[in-house]
Amino acid sequence: MATERAIFAGGCFWCMVQPFEEREGILSVISGYTGGNVENPTYEQVKKHLTGHTEAVEIIFDNSKITYQSLVELYWTLTDPTDAFGQFEDRGDNYRPVIFVENEEQEKIAKESKAQLQASGNFDSPIVTSIETVQKFWPAEDYHQGFYKKNPEDYAQSSKIRHDFLEKQWKK
């Protein structure tokens, strides 16, 4: 089995876990922080914009069962790629949309996919999701891991605006 890693930021990490976890070939999805300048950041620090980190998910996958390309395509359907200042009700640089790439192949796939999305005409505004080189990923505190399973009512409430937008946008 050949494993690979993908890191995506798309707003609150709670809402990014379930759609990836449900795919065949996904070995793990970890909520965490990346892109900042503080070692071992905490949720409270990131939430208060003290670290420069972005909430993200780290996905370990079996690339013989699922491709990086298919993960990028799924990622687009989980975000508003026209909003650089957060996602849905979550505002600020710690919620900005980013595809973090580990190598030239991931960068090529992400950039081509972004260009295809822009050319598709699905969005009236430009696609502003960043594509950046991966930095150290710090797993979030345990209570954030698998949040949608541990707290289904809180998860449903916190993700409602996101789900409403995505259903409307991607069912065109």
Swiss-Prot record:
It comes from Lactococcus lactis subsp. lactis (strain IL1403) (Streptococcus lactis). The keyword Transcription does not apply. This is Peptide methionine sulfoxide reductase MsrA 2. Keywords: Oxidoreductase. One of its GO terms (molecular function) is peptide-methionine (S)-S-oxide reductase activity. The keyword Oxidoreductase applies. It catalyses: L-methionyl-[protein] + [thioredoxin]-disulfide + H2O = L-methionyl-(S)-S-oxide-[protein] + [thioredoxin]-dithiol; [thioredoxin]-disulfide + L-methionine + H2O = L-methionine (S)-S-oxide + [thioredoxin]-dithiol. Belongs to the MsrA Met sulfoxide reductase family. Its EC number is 1.8.4.11. The gene is msrA2. It comes from the Bacteria. InterPro entries: Met_Sox_Rdtase_MsrA_dom (IPR002569), Met_Sox_Rdtase_MsrA_sf (IPR036509). Transmembrane segments: none annotated. Has an important function as a repair enzyme for proteins that have been inactivated by oxidation. Catalyzes the reversible oxidation-reduction of methionine sulfoxide in proteins to methionine. The active site is at 12. GO terms for biological process: protein modification process.
